[in-house]
């Protein structure tokens, strides 16, 4: 039995596993990161994690000027709660809490697919020209969006630096980008060494497996690149 996961299990799931006498083992197989993006025309270049928490948890801002940007409406978009992007959001920004229950987030600004997470933010400028949207996704999806027929990343959106560090292959791999993350293979800790699940994990860490990771659009682990 094996599971591919973009984040570690929630505290609740870990407790359920423990109650069932199961210990989970997480084996990192690829790099990824959570990224935030806004309309290309927005002169704002970055936010802090604290500001993101104020936006999505406390609904503290409604204008980009409050976070060092232009005098323009701030329109936050979110993902559906059963998405991998939202799982990272819960872990890294919400601290396993909930989104704000007021403001624009509650008024329907929810993207239910990876593709619409990008197109919704890109189109927000057309429907609300007095403001700029902000949304989030995972880095390697954002980079490969054009090949998945979501032609918005090159000229309609730009990524925001977080705590002064812009997301890139290099800053995600070396961990300096603060929202860097790993993708995991998840096994039972007592999975036998000669089991198919354990052999799959070993393959994913081999040079051949890391090539599969790269072809799938994720970042290969440093130790597997050499």
Regions from the PLM with identified roles:
Residues 1-32, 37-226:
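Exported/periplasmic ABC-transporter solute-binding proteins
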């Amino acid at each position: 039995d094996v599971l591919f996961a973009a984040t570690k299990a929630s505290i609740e799931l870990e407790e359920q596993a423990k109650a069932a006498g199961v210990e989970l083992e997480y084996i990192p197989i690829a790099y990824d990161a959570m990224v935030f993006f806004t309309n290309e025309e927005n002169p704002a270049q970055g936010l802090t994690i604290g500001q993101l928490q104020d936006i999505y948890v406390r609904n503290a801002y409604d204008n980009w000027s409050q976070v060092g940007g232009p005098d323009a409406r701030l329109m936050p978009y979110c993902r559906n709660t059963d998405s991998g992007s939202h799982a990272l959001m819960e872990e890294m920004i919400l601290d396993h809490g909930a989104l704000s229950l007021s403001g624009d987030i509650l008024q329907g600004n929810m993207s239910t697919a990876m593709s619409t997470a990008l197109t919704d933010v890109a189109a927000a400028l057309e429907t609300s020209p007095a403001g700029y949207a902000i949304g989030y996704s995972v880095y390697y999806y954002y980079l490969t969006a054009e090949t998945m027929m979501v032609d918005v990343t090159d000229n309609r959106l730009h990524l925001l630096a977080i705590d002064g560090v812009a997301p890139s292959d290099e800053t995600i791999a070396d961990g300096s980008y603060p929202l860097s993350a790993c993708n995991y293979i998840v096994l039972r800790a007592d999975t036998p060494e000669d089991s198919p699940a354990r052999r799959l994990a070993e393959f994913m860490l081999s040079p051949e497996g890391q090539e599969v990771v790269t072809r799938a659009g994720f970042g290969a682990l440093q130790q597997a690149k050499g």
